[in-house]
Each structure stands twice: as C-alpha cells, then as structure tokens.
C-alpha cells in the first residue's frame, strides 16, 4: 500500500506460504534496487530511493484475494524510518536481519540497523556443491 511518498510491500506467510519472509524481502529489495538503477541510467528523471526492511507481527486475513492487515507494534513505522535513512541503499532492522542472516550478507550500521550487501542464492550454491562432490567422486 502507499502512504505519501512511501510504498509498502507486506510479505505475510498467509500470502507467501513462506516462513522466511525476511529473506524474500531482501531479495525483492535487491530486484527493486536493480530496476531503479536501470531506470536512472536510461532516463532523465532520476528516482531517489531508500529501502527499509522491518520485521514484526500483524493481524491478517485474506478477503477477495487481497491481504487485509493491522500492524502490531511499530513494524510499519520502523520500515518507514529505515527507508528515510537508506539513501540509495537497503537497510534492515536488527530483528529482520537476525531472522535471515544465514542468507543475507550485511554490514552492521549501528545497534539496530544493518545495510544489505547481497542475498546468497542457497539453491545455486547447493547445486554447485553437489556437482563438485560428484566430480571429486564423493
């Protein structure tokens, strides 16, 4: 949904059928960043952006194939604050990073914030390791 200059994407296991939504959010943020950078190279009108990823609880239900939700706590406010600070970067809350740290490579910015460098493709790595082990006879 949109609020002012902010666009929020809510990833909820009710819709994604995935419990690792923090990792999916980081992957999505990388794709959005790449699309914006490509736009900014091709077009005169530059898009200023910053992406913030926060993790928290929501009350959710699906009505007419649309997610209806009420955030609990400050998950939306947290994401908005991170986005405001994230000048052309992707910032993630400590809580969200800790839930996805096995696949998300990031640099700690302060006690509560991480800057995402990249998201590891575990499937690609798994295939490489399997092929390597086959070639080495193990």
Would you name each region that the model predicts?
Residues 27, 72, 94-95:
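Short loop/turn segments at beta-alpha junctions that line or gate ligand-sensing/allosteric surfaces
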Residues 24-32:
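Short amphipathic alpha-helices in soluble, non-transmembrane regions
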Residues 1-21, 38-74:
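Catalytic core of nucleotidyl cyclases, primarily class III adenylyl/guanylyl cyclases
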Residues 34, 59, 66-67, 78-138:
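Intrinsically disordered, glycine/charged-rich C-terminal tails and inter-domain linkers
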Residues 16-24, 110-115:
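Short, structured secondary-structure boundary patches
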Residues 31-39:
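Short hydrophobic alpha-helical module
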């Amino acid at each position: 949904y949109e609020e002012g200059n902010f666009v929020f994407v809510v990833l909820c296991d009710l819709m994604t059928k995935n419990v690792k939504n923090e990792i999916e959010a980081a992957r999505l943020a990388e794709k959005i960043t790449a699309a914006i950078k490509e736009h900014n190279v091709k077009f005169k009108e530059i898009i200023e952006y910053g992406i913030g990823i926060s993790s928290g609880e929501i009350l959710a239900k699906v009505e007419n194939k649309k997610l209806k939700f009420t955030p609990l706590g400050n998950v939306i406010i947290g994401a908005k604050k991170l986005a405001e600070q994230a000048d052309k970067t992707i910032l993630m809350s400590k809580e969200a990073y800790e839930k996805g740290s096995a696949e998300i490579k990031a640099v700690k910015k302060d006690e509560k914030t991480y800057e995402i460098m990249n998201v590891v493709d575990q499937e690609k790595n798994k295939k490489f390791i399997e092929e390597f082990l086959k070639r080495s006879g193990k």
